[in-house]
Amino acid sequence: MKKNGILNKELNTLLASLGHTDTIVIADCGLPIPNEEARIDLALVKGFPPFLSVLDAVINELVVEEIVLAEEIKTQNPDVYESIKARMSDVPIQFVRHEEFKEMTKQAKAVIRTGEATPYANIILRSGVNFS
């Protein structure tokens, strides 16, 4: 058994497979997922696991060079938006309209579905490299 970090086999496999510029999505429970094969469904019940807990676990193990958020998160879910900014203050943010965000998810290697049930609690993470 792993000593610490992410225990989910599919999520570990995904993170280990990412190369530079690959993208993944962490999504609330309502975001449409375009490709069933690329879904890692962690949702257990409404609200669990929360988006921010999953984000924390992933960014603890992944080099992120850029994030993409829906523009609407700023006004429709300011608490989650501020929490993302606080956690990832050194990572550039690209903002797009929600419809464009949904189109961008089609290019992601996978969508990680959480139980989050607040609006626009979705993020695209672009993988960086761990070179010094």
Swiss-Prot record:
Role summary: Catalyzes the interconversion of beta-pyran and beta-furan forms of D-ribose.
Gene that encodes the chain: rbsD
Family of the protein in this entry: Belongs to the RbsD / FucU family. RbsD subfamily.
GO molecular function: D-ribose pyranase activity; intramolecular lyase activity; monosaccharide binding
Enzyme Commission designation: 5.4.99.62
UniProt subcellular location: Cytoplasm
Keyword terms, alphabetized: Carbohydrate metabolism, Cytoplasm, Isomerase
Protein name (Swiss-Prot/TrEMBL): D-ribose pyranase
Domain of life: Bacteria
UniProt xrefs under PANTHER family: D-RIBOSE PYRANASE
Intrachain disulfide bonds: none
Primary location: cytoplasm
Active site: 20 (proton donor)
